[in-house]
């Protein structure tokens, strides 16, 4: 399954948190199983992630606009956290 399909399935059947601040909260609570960041995610947030051991991350090849579209949202999404994957295989796709 490709990433966009896996992401959509996770959004529909699991628990996905959108936005940098909400993603940080999810990481701090220990709820984030996978963090996805857009290729153009701000360096400040990328630096924050690099200091978090044990957090699986996936860098989406597109921009925040494209990641938002992949989520089915009409707005920019520069970061998101997968807390529950639902029926998706997205947790196997980290890189």
Swiss-Prot record:
Listed A to Z, the keywords are:
Ribonucleoprotein, Ribosomal protein
What is the designated name of this protein? Answer: Large ribosomal subunit protein eL30
Secretion signal: which residues? none
Which superkingdom?
Archaea
Q: Would the keyword 4Fe-4S be found if you checked this record's keyword annotation?
A: no
Q: Which Pfam families match?
A: Ribosomal_L7Ae
Among the GO biological process terms of this entry, one is: translation
Keyword tRNA processing part of the UniProt annotation? no
User: Which family is this sequence assigned to?
Assistant: Belongs to the eukaryotic ribosomal protein eL30 family.
List the GO molecular function terms.
Answer: RNA binding; structural constituent of ribosome
Q: Which GO terms describe its cellular component?
A: cytosolic large ribosomal subunit
InterPro entries xrefs: Ribosomal_eL30 (IPR000231), Ribosomal_eL30-like (IPR039109), Ribosomal_eL30-like_sf (IPR029064), Ribosomal_eL8/eL30/eS12/Gad45 (IPR004038)
